[in-house]
């Protein structure tokens, strides 16, 4: 028999947010219910919350449409940000020199799963 699928995932690639800053937000929503995660993201001041909100929304939509899971029973099982390609820029400095500026990007992944029955 086929095993029932109880989780769904969504990924956003090359998001223009430093992974370190995205992880600060992802750490706060990990292992929370989806509704609680939405509430947390709505009121956090970090700029990365908009991108993370979109990925969470996509993961929930994947769970509902692809696997017929109920939104009320979902929790954020995994949430992580890996480093994407770095955009390298240069700032002119004194005496004709230049300093590098690294504009970092992230790959944000969120996995939602059904709550385990106790």
From Swiss-Prot:
Report TM segments: none
Q: Which UniProt keywords apply?
A: Ribonucleoprotein, Ribosomal protein, RNA-binding, rRNA-binding
* A Pfam short name: Ribosomal_L22
Supply one GO molecular-function term: rRNA binding
Extract the InterPro entries matched here.
Ribosomal_uL22 (IPR001063), Ribosomal_uL22_bac/chlpt-type (IPR005727), Ribosomal_uL22_bac/org-type (IPR047867), Ribosomal_uL22_CS (IPR018260), Ribosomal_uL22_sf (IPR036394)
Alphabetized PROSITE patterns for the sequence: RIBOSOMAL_L22 (PS00464)
Kindly state a single biological-process term from the GO annotations of this entry: translation
One GO CC term, this protein: cytosolic large ribosomal subunit
Q: Does the keyword Cytoplasm apply?
A: no
Q: What does this protein do?
A: This protein binds specifically to 23S rRNA; its binding is stimulated by other ribosomal proteins, e.g. L4, L17, and L20. It is important during the early stages of 50S assembly. It makes multiple contacts with different domains of the 23S rRNA in the assembled 50S subunit and ribosome. The globular domain of the protein is located near the polypeptide exit tunnel on the outside of the subunit, while an extended beta-hairpin is found that lines the wall of the exit tunnel in the center of the 70S ribosome.
- What's the subunit arrangement here? Part of the 50S ribosomal subunit.
Family membership:
Belongs to the universal ribosomal protein uL22 family.
Q: Which protein are we looking at? A: Large ribosomal subunit protein uL22
Q: Which organism is it from?
A: Leuconostoc citreum (strain KM20)
